[in-house]
């Protein structure tokens, strides 16, 4: 079985993230969305909330792929891959600046565990999009309805004003 992981903090998942996950689901038998837990990083949503938002976003997507699963990830992505027999990491690239960092990570992951990284170019309509930017715009009352899945929108608005 061809399996891949899409790692990230997904705080919250954006339409850009979802686009990469859906596209990856067409290329692999199973795609695991690995939601990272970093105790040193403050998040707007808890790990359980982020995982449930991702599950609902995938379930509510018009394609609703059945080969996407969501799991929590502690530590190195390559350790997550090794423990689950996953051979590939899928990463979305928004800009050349993303590539510089992600290439170094891909080479390190390959040297540590022989895990390959597949880079997918982001849909141009999401090239500027990041969870941090979405949270910032929402915090100031801006319209982010076109940037996040519907299931995320209500919770994001409630949390962003707290």
Swiss-Prot record:
Main location: cytoplasm
GO cellular component, one term: cytoplasm
EC number: 2.7.7.3
Enzyme class: transferase
InterPro entries: Cyt_trans-like, PPAT, Rossmann-like_a/b/a_fold
Pfam families: CTP_transf_like (PF01467)
Membership in a protein family: Belongs to the bacterial CoaD family.
The protein's assembly and partners: Homohexamer.
Protein name in the entry: Phosphopantetheine adenylyltransferase
Naturally occurring in which organism (per UniProt): Frankia alni (strain DSM 45986 / CECT 9034 / ACN14a)
